[in-house]
A protein has these predicted regions:
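N-terminus-centered regions that define maturation/targeting leaders and the start
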Residues: 17-182
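N-terminal secretory signal peptides that target proteins for export/translocation
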Residues: 1-2
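Bacterial N-terminal signal peptides
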Residues: 5-16
């Protein structure tokens, strides 16, 4: 009987280690690395390619009904940060986004997904473009696994409004941070 209890305790302690951890990554932007010129905004004094990075994820909770992704700069000199990309209603079967999925007229983002307004004043991806001379800013990419099939918002919703819905309906999230300065 004592052996059975020890076996049960061992299984309970080690099972979590076998479960896949929810992770988000990019083949072109390393966690804690520098964001390349191809992903930098084209405007506001920046001359990058404004191509959203390819992203991939694994280990999402089994009860995920949809995903949402945000890119946020907490260091922007606004007092409230800067939303660079907000895309939601991504299907639960998805495990990656190709490069340039943030381009609105490219037809690359998954059907049914919605890209809402960024702090650049338009929907779709808007790459890094911190003020010249600032220390490198942090850009946080976060993928949310949601308990909703659809976030009930449109493309004119602000990043803050979408963020509220995401946090209220989140099952899990995975993030990585990268840097850019000029």
């Amino acid at each position: 009987m004592v052996r059975l209890w020890w076996l049960l305790i061992f299984v309970m302690l080690t099972t979590k280690g076998w479960a896949a951890e929810f992770q988000l990554s990019s083949p072109t932007i390393k966690s804690q690395g520098k964001i390349g010129h191809e992903h930098v905004f084209a405007g506001f004094g920046c001359s990058g390619g404004n191509v959203s990075p390819a992203l991939q994820w694994q280990g999402a909770p089994k009860d995920t009904k949809s995903f949402a992704l945000t890119m946020y700069d907490p260091d922007a000199p606004t007092g409230s940060g800067w939303w660079h990309w907000v895309i939601f209603n991504l299907p639960p079967t998805l495990n990656s986004l190709p490069a340039n999925a943030g381009k609105l007229d490219g037809g690359i983002a998954p059907a049914g997904s919605i890209q809402s307004v960024t702090d650049f004043g338009q929907p779709g991806y808007g790459g890094p473009c911190p003020p010249a001379g600032d220390k490198p800013h942090r850009y946080i990419f976060t993928l949310y696994a949601l308990k909703l099939d659809q976030v009930p918002l449109r493309s004119d919703a602000s990043g803050a409004m979408v963020g509220f819905y995401l946090r209220q309906n989140m099952i899990a999230k995975a993030s990585f941070t990268a840097f850019y300065g000029r």
